[in-house]
Structures are given as structure tokens and as C-alpha cells.
């Protein structure tokens, strides 16, 4: 057994409009556990990330997050019920079964970060 044990890994997600993005993620279902003017720690259960008041278009346009959930359709219903796509003028598409054994949907946050929210399914 290695002595190099790990606890978790977190991404620093860029935000073009820090306050707007913080609200977006709260509407999506994340809680703000801690926040300053330049950084916020957000989590949902055991999943977390750091939202940073930092924006470079090339970074944001190529940044992706993947959230694995137990019920992707429940998450999609939540996104629709809260009107998140229209409220934030973002792109979001309904869940689809993928050939690699996942059912997921995509949404793009107000900064341009692509999120894939999905659940594992059995491959045909």
C-alpha cells in the first residue's frame, strides 16, 4: 500500500461574473460553504469545487466538469422546474443514453464552462 494517500481533488472553475455564477450554482443545487470576494467553496453532498473570480475566455471555453449522479432524470427535472436555462440564458439539452454506458445531459454555465451531468447505465 502506498503512503501517498489522497482525500479528494477539486477543480477551480472560472467565473466571468462571480456573483451571477454563484447564484447559478446555488439554483443548480450546490451550497456555498464558504465565500470571499475572489473564491467560493461549493458542494453538493460529497462533491465540491472552487468557483474563482477569474476569467480567461480560452480557459472557460475549454473547461469541462463531469458530475456523476444516481438519478440524472431527477437532476434534469430540477433544471427544467427551476427554469435555469432561460433564467441564465444558457444552453442545456435533455438526457441521452450514450454508447459508452452513461446517460447524461449537458449544460453550459454563464461563463461558458461545459457541465456533463450523468449516471452510469448498463451498456447494451
What are these regions (language model features)?
Residues 1-19, 65, 118-124:
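N-terminal beta-strand motif that seeds the catalytic metal site of vicinal oxygen chelate
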Residues 4-7, 57-62, 99:
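Short glycine-enriched loop/turn motifs at secondary-structure junctions
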Residues 5-8, 12-49:
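Core segments of cupin and vicinal oxygen chelate
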Residues 8, 14, 50, 94, ...:
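Conserved beta-strand segments that form the floor/walls of ligand-binding pockets within enzyme
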Residues 25, 55, 79-80:
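Short, flexible helix/strand-to-coil boundary loops that buttress conserved ligand/catalytic motifs
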Residues 31-69, 114-119:
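Conserved short beta-strand elements that form part of the metal-binding/catalytic scaffold
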Residues 56, 92, 98, 119-123:
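Acetyl-CoA-dependent GNAT
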Residues 65-114:
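Vicinal oxygen chelate
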Amino acid at each position: 500500500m502506498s503512503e501517498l494517500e489522497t482525500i479528494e481533488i477539486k477543480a477551480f472553475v472560472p467565473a466571468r461574473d462571480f456573483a451571477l455564477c454563484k447564484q447559478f450554482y446555488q439554483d443548480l443545487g450546490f451550497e456555498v460553504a464558504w465565500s470571499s470576494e475572489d473564491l467560493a467553496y461549493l458542494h453538493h453532498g460529497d462533491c465540491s469545487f472552487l468557483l474563482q473570480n477569474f476569467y480567461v475566455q480560452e480557459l472557460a471555453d475549454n473547461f469541462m466538469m463531469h458530475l456523476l449522479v444516481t438519478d440524472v432524470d431527477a437532476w434534469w427535472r430540477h433544471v427544467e422546474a427551476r427554469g435555469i436555462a432561460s433564467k441564465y440564458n444558457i444552453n442545456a439539452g435533455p438526457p441521452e443514453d450514450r454508447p459508452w454506458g452513461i446517460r447524461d445531459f449537458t449544460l453550459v454555465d454563464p461563463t461558458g464552462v461545459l457541465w456533463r451531468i450523468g449516471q452510469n447505465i448498463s451498456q447494451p
